[in-house]
């Protein structure tokens, strides 16, 4: 599952959404329930004195002239050189302007143009030094543009004022924007407070990336309070921040009652074993999380054991990544045995790929996978053997499938579709792994299934059978 690739939920009508949120109609009520820290007074930039306002006074001009002409006029207005790439691609759904050195005035010209644009759905503006003025132009544009759905303004050094402007916009809930990437913007504790105050009542944003910022434990407390109230977020990336035990516990406490978040990435932080304990307790209660990444968080065998307690009772988690934690064979055992003891476990992917295991572990894992055939456990290798010799695929699974379909005079597509009850060309990874291992026509083990999935998997957690046509197998059976 790729970072932030959870699809947005179907949008409700405005009346339906407001009705659903009626019990939380005031900020006072929200913050009283969450017991959040005192709010930061928000001083909006004075619009009259701001050089970032979208200044074309004749609003009809936004819609009466072509996009190219409007952009050229906007560039002339703000005094910047037009970007040829933008002109060539302004009718495409994805506009990638990462690393273009646009600056705040270049962003302003683009924002003026996008006010009336109906084709760009995804706007990439990473690393453009857009500053406070640039982000203000973008937020003003989003007040008018109801087509743009995804925005990336990572690595733009937005800081506190940028966070304030974004928070003001998020509180209004009046755009189609559902995916927002704010990675690497030097956001600290006060920024977290502003953003969390806005997100506590925002139901539009489904995917939020706040990785590579400077959040520590106090920010973790704000985020935990927000998660207890938020009814929109499905994916949250907080990797590469500075959360330690206090922040980890606060985050996990917020997740206990959260009913929408499916994907959480907190890798490269400092949860430690106490944070792992909080996560384990959360997994006992949470009925929504599907994907959790706690890679490189200083979690030892003790922490793995504590997470295992949650896995024994959890009925929704599918992916757990524990890569680069100091977990050994003992911790690996506790994890797979917890899954074995849970007949309702939906675990599909356990990543302990820095752990060397024993032959006895592999035998136990075989037994676990017999109960849960959708499960794949990725480990480094077998103790005493080189990594290359640890797993032998024997025969390439592609070749096995080709031989079977040739002998039975059926197409490969027909074989794959027979595995899918819906008869479609796509299938969830876990369901496919279970089906390909359990089918009796072709002897495919879990290692071969893993290789097959690598070739057919898309970034959205689905395998696409049409990808088989592009795979070539040599006479030796190698891809």
Swiss-Prot record:
Q: Which InterPro entries match?
A: Leu-rich_rpt, LRR-containing, LRR_dom_sf
Q: Where are the LRR repeats?
A: 119-140, 147-167, 176-197, 204-225, 232-253, 260-281, 288-309, 316-336
Q: Which residues form a coiled coil?
A: none
Q: Which Gene3D superfamilies match?
A: Ribonuclease Inhibitor (3.80.10.10)
Region annotation Disordered: where it falls in the sequence: 1-29
Q: Which domain of life is it from?
A: Eukaryota
Q: Where is the composition biased (Acidic residues)?
A: 1-10
Keywords for this protein:
Leucine-rich repeat, Repeat
Recorded hits in SUPFAM superfamilies, A to Z, give:
RNI-like
**Classification via Pfam families:** LRR_6
Listed name of the protein: Leucine-rich repeat-containing protein 74A
Record organism: Rattus norvegicus (Rat)
